[in-house]
Amino acid sequence: LGIINVRKMEFLTFSPENHCFSEFLDGSDGDEEEILVCGEDLELNPFDGLPYSSRYYRLMKEREELPIWKEKCTFMESLLHNQIVIVSGDAKTGKSSQIPQWCAEHCLAVRPRRAVVCTQVLRPAAVGLALRVADQMDVNLGHEVGYAVPFESCCSPETILRYCTDEVLQREMMSTPLLPAYGVIVLDDVHERTVATEALLGLLKDVLAARAELRLVLLTAPHMWRTLRGHCDRAPLIRVRGTHRAQAVYSCSTHSEPFLAALRLLLELHHTRESGDIVVFLACEQDIEKADQMIRQEQSNLNPDLGELIPIPLYPTRQDLTPKPPREKQKSCKKYRRKVLLTTSSGEPLVWTKNVTFVIDVGVGSRKVYNPRIRADSVLTQPISQSRAEMHKQILGMAPSGKLFCLYPEEFLSKEMKAETPAKVQESKLTSMVLFLKRMDIAGFAHCDFISSP
């Protein structure tokens, strides 16, 4: 039957100049085309009707190694017979990429005219997941899989699976309160407790009562599943754990300059020649910029035999994504290249590389808190929560010999850190939320079923 050239990543309104995950982030080989030799029986992709490419089968083997994969049958059965399903899993177990795909399979089989929407707390996470899932499903970004973030949309009427921020879905409810276009709604990172996600949790309970065929899937970190089950009338729970348990190494004392201590430790790890990428959790985005500059300056002073340090800044609140490095630089570098991912404590969803072996945690983070007395936001730098520290450790769940370096003593974890991060609805200015509830004809906060009262 000859040879078919299948071009699978067709970007519509997506602009590679503005949004581009570098090849060294996703571990791909950079091939733009897959060549498939046709035999007598070709397996067709049910989402676009085209034969699967050979890359699809390679990625399928990687997907089957994810910890979440063994729960697929249990999840599909729970989704078929329950309106709400809760999935509690460690970080990097694959729930954010695989669960929405399974929901799309459910809609294709049970509700063919309905789509799936999956919310993300961070804009870069929504775009990055859409790129990765479109690749795994062997479909075109902007057609069968798309994304919608503030001021940018890459979707079409044929889109079956859409990633978006929680604020985008909240605004969509203003025009269509019952969300009739969707058969399954997936709320990811519920444990982040953003204002938009909290509002969606309360409002979607009324939507579920009006639409018996609608399904709601909640993805959360392990520390919050009990709270969600109590809020959702004992909905079925699926629990997923990482493959490996990382070793935590604590500092003897609290560092007066945790930023400089983190950079010193980073260089020490690089000098050990142990393989693996490094994630550094810093206090604020200004520290990310400084660390990026200092690592690039120090690069010229390092022994070339150690290999190259590649800092990759990941900003949770910024609109741009990681720029693609020049291809000629990638090809010319033959020595070992170690990636250093720089982010803040809330940037954990942006870290999804598979080769992370070391994590450095400064133990503090900055967050914005609204002060009603002065009617202004204040930026506070405080110790992170115990649940957040555990999530930093879970990033190493796929590494058999991963280590978490905590730049604080172990007693600091139990004495100075709170058990959980407070809900944003209790610390943020709620003017926009009040206007949203008024638009939805809801009298006030008491009539919206929040997990935590504002």
Task: Walk through the language-model features, giving the residues of each.
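P-loop NTPase motor module signature
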Residues: L1-P454
